[in-house]
Regions:
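C-terminal alpha-helix
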Residues: 54, 58, 182-194
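Short, function-defining helix-loop hinge/capping sites that tune catalysis or transport
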Residues: 17, 104, 153, 157-159, ...
């Protein structure tokens, strides 16, 4: 079985939204997993703990470190888990995720604050998401995103190990076959570089 990959959906989305991405990863030889949390709506300490438990379960059952791919809000989970559990994470990949800079430089922050009991500036975790986690990281971003400002999804050079610009809109980043081909290619390149 290939490298396990935990795929975390964006805000107001669930595992169905990442079905094509996971199917493509499986076809490419990876071992993908959905997050199994229903729709990604509220960020709470309990939700974070459950996703952390999901990561630990996958790492334990496969005996391998896990690649985490997070789309939009899911990417914040990916980076958070990479900070908290680096011993379980092989690579953290963000797809159009607003992890850097102004947390209001996107078209979803007002909705996020309506759905949650905290502001975008005071999330329910102490980790600084913009700081590079102690594991390899890839940020995928787009100037055509339309939801998240490119500079917030790209981040500063010292906030990720690699940054890839994709010419797609926000809702295509994890569902377009062309975007998925780039994601799968980046994962294959990482796996090749990881080999001794």
């Amino acid at each position: 079985m290939g490298r396990p990959v935990l795929v975390i959906p964006g805000m107001l989305s669930g595992d169905r939204s990442t079905a094509l991405l996971r199917a493509s990863l499986r076809q490419a030889g990876f071992d993908p997993y959905g997050w199994q949390e229903g729709f990604n709506v509220r960020v709470t300490t309990q939700a974070i703990a459950r996703v952390e438990g999901r990561l630990a379960d996958i790492a334990t059952s496969t005996g391998r470190k896990v690649v985490i791919i997070g789309w939009s809000l899911g990417g914040l989970y990916a980076r958070l888990l990479a900070h908290r559990r680096p011993e379980l994470v092989a690579l953290a990949v963000t797809l159009g995720s607003p992890f850097s800079g102004n947390r209001r430089a996107n078209n979803a922050w007002r909705l996020y604050e309506r759905l949650n009991d905290h502001t975008v500036d005071a999330p329910p975790f102490p980790e600084e998401i913009s700081a590079k986690p102690p594991v390899p990281t890839i940020a995928m971003w787009s100037t055509k995103d339309g939801i998240v400002a490119a500079e917030c999804a790209r981040g500063a050079p010292d906030e990720s190990d690699a940054r890839f610009e994709l010419p797609y809109r926000h809702f295509e980043l994890g569902s377009s076959r062309r975007a998925i081909a780039v994601i799968v290619g980046a994962l294959h390149n990482f796996m090749e570089e990881e080999r001794p």
